């Protein structure tokens, strides 16, 4: 069992206190959980209880919806769609950080909102790039979008990546980024952040199940060379990936970002445990289902030992902790 500080991605931001605080379900504030004493789980420099009181004991206004002009649409065999659209400057600034995502819809019907990670947010041009894998009824409607039309988005949201604290702590070190499939999209802001903090970044990409390399253009922009290799083989870590990780550790890498499905993250953690390298810091994609993004609907919740319910659209976590003690009934 590892010691973990509970953290809320929205604590101390313009969207705090939220509806959870208003209803006594705040992730951080003990008094807004029903206790009669002050014992914040992870203080962010702002008293959430005081903020709620100053706001008339009501939650602050939530995220807004925006109608944005589409600048470019690239369709990759009706499997993946890359969309570039122009957003308000404030929104572009808010979506630069790792883990940023938005809810996208072709129209104003909220039933068709789909959470999509930000691939790039250019604060010079206010152009935001997203990559959408076409899977079901929500994403199929996105195939109809064309340049010079409008797209409805809601945001900003920031909990698309677990282990943000570990990303921010990397300065002047060596990092390894492992990405598979659609995970190349949320990988890009992480790489941008690591490079801005003078890190030496090695990137390995597994295109499976696609044939196109969607990140090639942006990696060239950041002057990063990526090598391609098979990272997963029939649900387990491939021999190639094990060699890549072992060699990276010998070279002094002390941080790994895993951009892919939960099974990929789990396998990397298991392999590091076998190597007795629990000292390696990690970050990974947040693959929990998202619906409202505010911790209200319960789509993102998971149950853990000790009758704990965690809302992962808001709660930041260390990648190792999202599998430890998790219950499936």
Which residue ranges define each predicted feature?
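Local cysteine-cluster metal-coordination motifs and their immediate loop/turn environment
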Residues: 17-41, 286-319
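FNR/FR-type flavoprotein reductase catalytic core
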Residues: 137-291
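Short Fe-S-cluster ligation motifs
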Residues: 6, 53-74, 313-329
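Ferredoxin-reductase
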Residues: 55-152
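Short, charged low-complexity linear segments at domain edges
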Residues: 1-24, 76, 257, 262-289, ...
